[in-house]
């Protein structure tokens, strides 16, 4: 399986994540995907061919293997990692939408050159407003997917340990036959390791949700105690009504200053311009 596309996607979202989110991504790729690709797939590569039963009845090996291993461990973990990583698409789409709106605002303001547009693409979007909700929802879905897959894994393989010998009496086996599992100890070690990594990811997801809620409450309390500063040039600042009003006031003040310069330079026409200025002020 090629994980390059998934890595590229999550790396892009990682730029806008919290510190806990970056740790989660490291656990996903170092302790889960790398182990799955490098070691686990080779360990489970012969699981079907090396599952041997002490009978020559055609089809007995296949039905016994399907009874005790309905879903391969590797395929189940691969599906789990894909679904756990999918909620990051929600954050990626939201960030792309915000950057698209900001680029449109820059073009309307006359700053649509490639340098400014590339700067918008590179700068980090702060987790606030609707992005905060999108990020929290994505983390909650990651948490739910992890918990559901661990429960499904427990239902399929109770105890999480790989047995050495299983007894099978499913048709078309002539009687109760003994079937032997290849590399049971090695598979048990990898199973425990992958489940432990999944448990660590669950803890990180819970910690990230708590951290985001606490930080949002702290920001709200700070805004209530101290009025928000109007300085800065972030995305929210560019689209806020205060920013737009400040820009309008700046343009009006520049026009007023230009009018005063004209009055100083042309005393003869100063009275007429002053009268027009007074009429405009009265309006």
Swiss-Prot record:
A GO-annotated cellular component: connexin complex
Source taxon at top rank: Eukaryota
Spans within the Cytoplasmic topological domain: 1-22, 96-130, 215-283
GO biological process, one term: cell-cell signaling
UniProt keyword list: Cell junction, Cell membrane, Gap junction, Membrane, Phosphoprotein, Transmembrane, Transmembrane helix
Coiled coil keyword on record: no
Phosphoserine: residues carrying this PTM: 233, 258, 266, 277
PROSITE patterns, alphabetized: CONNEXINS_1 (PS00407), CONNEXINS_2 (PS00408)
Database matches in InterPro entries: Connexin (IPR000500), Connexin32 (IPR002267), Connexin_CCC (IPR019570), Connexin_CS (IPR017990), Connexin_N (IPR013092), Connexin_N_sf (IPR038359)
Keyword Methyltransferase: no
Gene3D superfamilies xrefs: Gap junction channel protein cysteine-rich domain
Residue ranges, Extracellular side: 46-75, 154-191
A GO molecular-function descriptor: gap junction channel activity
Membrane-protein topology: Multi-pass membrane protein
Family: Belongs to the connexin family. Beta-type (group I) subfamily.
Function: One gap junction consists of a cluster of closely packed pairs of transmembrane channels, the connexons, through which materials of low MW diffuse from one cell to a neighboring cell.
PANTHER family on file: CONNEXIN, GAP JUNCTION BETA-1 PROTEIN
Subunit text: A connexon is composed of a hexamer of connexins. Interacts with CNST.
Protein name: Gap junction beta-1 protein
């Amino acid at each position: 399986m090629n994980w390059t596309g998934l890595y590229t996607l999550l790396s892009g979202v990682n730029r806008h994540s919290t510190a806990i989110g970056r740790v989660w991504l490291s656990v996903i790729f170092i302790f889960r995907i790398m182990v799955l690709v490098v070691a686990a797939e080779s360990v489970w590569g012969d699981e079907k061919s090396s599952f041997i039963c002490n009978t020559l009845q055609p089809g007995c090996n296949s039905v016994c293997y399907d009874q005790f291993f309905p879903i391969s461990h590797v395929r189940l973990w691969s599906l789990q990692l894909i679904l756990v990583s999918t909620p990051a698409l929600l954050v990626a789409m939201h960030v792309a939408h915000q950057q698209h709106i900001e680029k449109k605002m820059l073009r309307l303001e006359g700053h649509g050159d490639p340098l400014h547009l590339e700067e918008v693409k590179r700068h980090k979007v702060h987790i606030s407003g609707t992005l905060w909700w999108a990020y929290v929802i994505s983390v909650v879905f990651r948490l739910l997917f992890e918990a559901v897959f661990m429960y499904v894994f427990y239902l399929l393989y109770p105890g999480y340990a790989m047995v050495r010998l299983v007894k099978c009496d499913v048709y078309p086996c002539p009687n109760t036959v003994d079937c032997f599992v290849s590399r049971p100890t090695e598979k048990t070690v990898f199973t425990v390791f992958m489940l432990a990594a999944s448990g660590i990811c669950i803890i990180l997801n819970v910690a990230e949700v708590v951290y985001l809620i606490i930080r949002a409450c702290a920001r709200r309390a700070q805004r209530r105690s101290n009025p928000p500063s109007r300085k800065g040039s972030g995305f929210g600042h560019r689209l806020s009504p205060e920013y737009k009003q400040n820009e309008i006031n700046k343009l009006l003040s520049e026009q007023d200053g230009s009018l005063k310069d004209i009055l100083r330079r042309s005393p003869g026409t100063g009275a007429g311009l002053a009268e027009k200025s007074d009429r405009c002020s009265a309006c």
